[in-house]
Curated annotation (Swiss-Prot):
Its EC number is 1.2.1.38. One of its GO terms (molecular function) is N-acetyl-gamma-glutamyl-phosphate reductase activity. It comes from the Bacteria. InterPro entries: AGPR_AS, AGPR_type-1, NAD(P)-bd_dom_sf, NAGSA_dehydrogenase, Semialdehyde_DH_NAD-bd. It catalyses: N-acetyl-L-glutamate 5-semialdehyde + phosphate + NADP(+) = N-acetyl-L-glutamyl 5-phosphate + NADPH + H(+). Pfam families: Semialdhyde_dh (PF01118), Semialdhyde_dhC_1 (PF22698). Keywords: Amino-acid biosynthesis, Arginine biosynthesis, Cytoplasm, NADP, Oxidoreductase. The active site is at C155. It is an enzyme of class 1 (oxidoreductase). This is N-acetyl-gamma-glutamyl-phosphate reductase. One of its GO terms (biological process) is L-arginine biosynthetic process. It comes from Gloeothece citriformis (strain PCC 7424) (Cyanothece sp. (strain PCC 7424)).
């Protein structure tokens, strides 16, 4: 593709935090042009009325969702909609020749019975769902390149799976001992008002939620099972912390070989992610901080071994809105189009 040729893309559900992150990234992407911003609840409004800080670079209105119109204008469509809506739109867009990247949970599962159990929506699109590819490029790069439909991962699963993948793929841990303790900023709850995300409620406080029943649990387990080659069950507990963005997931598991030391695992992780430009393995004794990943598409991994308990401890830090959502979707787009994987994606944080 030449330097001046751009593909037309659309975003359905552009008014949420994931949507505005997509807009920001795609505005600066050299190979795309945003030709459609959609959302029925905001239809008719200038996009800059919703996000005034973009008044100088986004002149488009939010348009009503019209599949025929979208397909006639867009080669690629991002779906940033609530769970349970994308599965009604994606089949129609695919039929009309669009590539589709879904940021909801609708196409993350191979088994729709699992989806229906956890998301309380019956599905009849199994034939479409089996064509989707889980959009974690570090694990499924080749499949993403060949797919027309991507189910982009959740933010917690992204951080957790990147921490666990080398251990499961190489059989280094006892899978059923895996525990994921994860903490996220309030932007993960979305832009709509929620009591627990109010400043007066969240500031100066830390608490768990969705204990033993968070919807990201089956998503994590399905990919873990794929990596391990057998069914895997994990213990996952998320927490809300009083900051805007970022996830820190700390993963614990028992090593099969208690003789493994930290240096061994760092070597193993570096080899596993040697072709993954956005995963950074930290040196001995350095542990990640969410600030380092803020505004970037990076995942920082820190590794430790506790010889007293024979457990490995892996800490994973990402920006929940970039690597955990919009940035990862753009990373998948780059692969689908045959472009450089890092194109248009930030790798330097704002610091301090």
């Amino acid at each position: 593709m030449g330097d001046t040729e751009q593909i037309p893309v659309g975003i359905i559900g552009a008014s949420g935090y994931g949507g505005v992150q997509l807009v920001r990234l795609l505005i600066e992407h050299p190979n795309v042009e945003i030709v459609y911003l959609g959302g029925d609840s905001s239809a008719g409004k200038p996009y800059s009325d919703i996000y005034p800080h973009l008044f100088h670079c986004v002149n488009q209105p939010v348009e009503a969702i019209d599949i025929d119109e979208i397909a006639s204008r867009c080669q690629v469509v991002f779906l940033g909609l609530p769970n349970g809506i994308a599965c009604d739109l994606a089949p129609k867009l695919l039929e009309k020749g669009c590539k589709v990247l879904d940021l909801s949970a609708d196409y993350r599962f191979r088994n729709l019975e699992t989806y229906s159990t956890w998301y309380k929506k019956d599905r009849t699109d199994q034939a479409i769902a089996v064509r989707s590819v889980y959009g974690l490029p570090e694990l499924y790069q080749q499949q993403i390149k060949e797919s027309q439909l991507i189910g982009c991962p959740g933010c917690y699963p992204t951080a957790s799976l990147l921490a666990l993948a080398p251990l499961l793929k190489q059989g280094l841990i006892v899978p059923e001992t895996a525990i994921i303790d994860a903490k996220s900023g309030t932007s993960g709850a979305g832009r709509q008002a929620k009591i627990n995300a109010l400043l007066a409620e969240a500031d100066g406080s830390l608490g768990a939620y969705g204990v033993a029943k968070h919807r990201h649990t089956p998503e994590i387990e399905e990919v873990c099972s794929d990596l391990a080659g057998h069914e895997v069950t994990v213990q996952f507990t998320p927490h809300l912390i009083p900051m805007i963005r970022g996830i820190l997931a700390t993963v614990y598991a028992t090593l099969r070989d208690p003789g493994l030391v930290r240096e061994d695992l760092i070597t193993i992780y570096n080899a596993f992610y040697r072709s993954s430009p956005f995963v950074k393995i930290l040196p001995n004794g350095i542990y990640p901080q969410t600030k380092w990943a803020c505004g970037t598409n990076l995942c920082y991994l820190g590794i430790e071994v506790d010889p007293r308990t024979d457990r490995v401890i892996v800490m994973s830090a990402i920006d929940n809105l970039i690597k955990g959502q919009a940035g990862q979707a753009v990373q998948c787009l780059n692969l689908m189009m045959g472009w450089e994987e890092t194109l248009g994606l930030p790798q330097l944080c704002f610091y301090p």
